[in-house]
């Protein structure tokens, strides 16, 4: 095991320079698979945030003085550097977040690159329009950068979700202060270095690491921040929204989920159960859109439970660095305690624990894939986001019953529908309260389609052209022709 003096020290990245935190404090970053220290990370302060905001504000003019086509080329160079350093980025993400290296190589890093390339293509396509109002005036609109953006990034997909915020903001001409999650900062810091190498001017992309209660709160309160974008828990999202109200910052929130996966009796059960297992056990269930509620029609309920349990037992839990591993650890000891606490809650509420529900090994935050049967809609394990590999299988009687149960939580991020009846799947998709509905598939996202929810799942959308609106302000211009 490395001692603290052996660990690499990661400073803040502000205005193109690596800076020690003003407090001089560093925290130990932990590998969740081994519980061993892997790095020392700067603990930023409110003063460090202020320095970063001033750097970002000054860099706005520099970034917007660069022709849009050249900004696009810079972002494409960054995408190329990410691709050239894919192995390094994947190794950092796997080490820091406990994610299986095979999944990170296949999805996380390529998806982040795809997002950046997509928005690089937007740089010279952010247009206003001429709006005919009266014959003696030329009236038109412009879209201008919203300004300085604070992006607060979660720990479950650090680089991928970080890029959902960074790429469109940069394409729109904004500058950023990125606050990665305290426990998964490494890929954000490396991205900041690659951005400078690609030609992103100093101050355009700043990385300030540290605690949410310090760095996050300072970003929320700072009057120099024009826009906040956050992915995380509803409780933190509420606090951010309340804090941002003090100076009327624009806010986008992507919060929790308790997504329902509806399996009707005419569904292809092989495909449905395979996708249901992936939908809850992928990334150890630490996914906002995880299909944690599996709603099965009474005619196929027992078969769905049996098949799902078999798939849960077949999941290869273990070392994230091993190519055959399909599920790694939970992110932290605290998250493991939360998940195991919900297992006990489910049992005490009367649900049937079919498989899993225990810690794996003595080192690392591993928990067996877990399946509960005979779950009632009102139970806490059916209503509350667990953020772990815990599936609740709920029985329904008919289409109306399924929709009632699916819509019966505070969340509305995503849902899945499995049926061979074309009329049914369209009816159910229409009636489900969800930002995304998958039909006879589950879990896909793409930067070209909007992503987000409502209620405790947040508000606003990321991805696609909607994100361009998130990071720009419209301006109306009147020119009197006859003057």
Model-derived features: where do they sit?
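Short, well-ordered beta-strand elements within core beta-sheets of diverse protein domains
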Residues: 37-44, 59-65, 151, 261-264, ...
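ALDH superfamily catalytic-core signature
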Residues: 235-376, 439
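Residue-level signal for inorganic ion chemistry
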Residues: 35, 71, 93, 116, ...
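Rossmann-like NAD(P) dinucleotide-binding subdomain of oxidoreductase/dehydrogenase enzymes
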Residues: 127-271, 396
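Conserved C-terminal structural/oligomerization subdomain of aldehyde/semialdehyde dehydrogenase
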Residues: 36-40, 225, 262, 316, ...
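Terminal low-complexity tails and localization/encapsulation signals of metabolic enzymes
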Residues: 1-40, 73, 77, 126-152, ...
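Glycine-rich loop-to-alpha-helix module at the N-terminal edge of alpha/beta enzyme cores
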Residues: 36-126
């Amino acid at each position: 095991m490395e001692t603290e003096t052996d660990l690499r020290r990661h400073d803040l990245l502000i205005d193109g320079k690596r800076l020690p935190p003003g407090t001089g404090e560093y925290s130990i970053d932990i590998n969740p698979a081994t519980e061993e220290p892997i790095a020392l990370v700067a603990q930023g302060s409110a003063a460090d945030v202020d320095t970063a905001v001033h750097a970002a504000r000054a860099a706005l003019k520099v970034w917007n003085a660069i022709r849009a086509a050249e900004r696009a080329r810079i972002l494409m160079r960054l995408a190329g550097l990410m691709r050239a350093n894919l192995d390094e980025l994947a190794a950092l993400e796997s080490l820091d977040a406990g994610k299986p290296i095979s999944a990170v190589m296949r999805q996380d890093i390529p998806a982040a690159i795809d997002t950046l390339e997509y928005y690089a293509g937007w740089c010279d396509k952010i247009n206003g329009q001429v709006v005919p109002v009266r014959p003696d005036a030329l009236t038109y609109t412009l879209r201008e950068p919203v300004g300085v953006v604070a992006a607060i990034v979660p720990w479950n997909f650090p680089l991928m979700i970080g890029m959902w915020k960074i790429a469109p903001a940069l394409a729109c001409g904004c500058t950023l202060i990125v606050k990665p999650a305290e426990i998964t900062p490494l890929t954000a810091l490396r991205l900041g270095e690659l951005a400078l190498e690609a030609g992103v001017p100093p101050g355009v992309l700043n990385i300030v690491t540290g605690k949410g209660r310090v760095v996050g709160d300072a970003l929320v309160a700072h009057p120099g921040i024009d826009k906040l974008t956050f992915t995380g828990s509803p409780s933190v999202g509420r606090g951010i929204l309340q804090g941002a109200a003090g100076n009327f910052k624009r806010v986008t929130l992507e919060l929790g989920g308790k997504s329902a996966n509806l399996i009707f009796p005419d569904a292809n059960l092989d495909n449905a159960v395979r996708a249901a297992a992936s939908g809850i056990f992928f990334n150890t269930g630490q996914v906002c859109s995880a299909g944690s509620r599996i709603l099965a029609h009474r005619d196929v309920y027992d078969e769905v439970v049996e098949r799902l349990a078999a798939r849960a037992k077949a999941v290869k839990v273990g070392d994230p660095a091993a190519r055959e591993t399909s599920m790694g650890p939970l992110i932290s000891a605290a998250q493991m305690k939360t998940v195991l606490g919900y297992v006990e809650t489910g049992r005490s509420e009367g649900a049937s624990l079919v498989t899993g529900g225990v810690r794996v090994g003595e080192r690392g935050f591993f928990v067996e894939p877990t399946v509960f049967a005979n779950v009632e809609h009102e139970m806490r394990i059916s209503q509350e986001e667990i953020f772990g590999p815990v599936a609740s299988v709920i029985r329904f009687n008919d289409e109306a019953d399924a929709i009632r149960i699916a819509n019966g939580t505070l969340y509305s991020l995503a849902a899945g529908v499995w049926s061979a009846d074309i009329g049914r799947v369209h009816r159910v998709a229409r009636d489900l309260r969800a930002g995304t509905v998958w039909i006879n598939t589950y879990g896909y996202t793409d930067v070209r389609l909007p992503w987000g929810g409502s209620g405790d799942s947040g508000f606003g959308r990321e991805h696609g052209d909607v994100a361009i609106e998130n990071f720009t302000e419209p301006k109306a211009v009147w020119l009197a022709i006859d003057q």
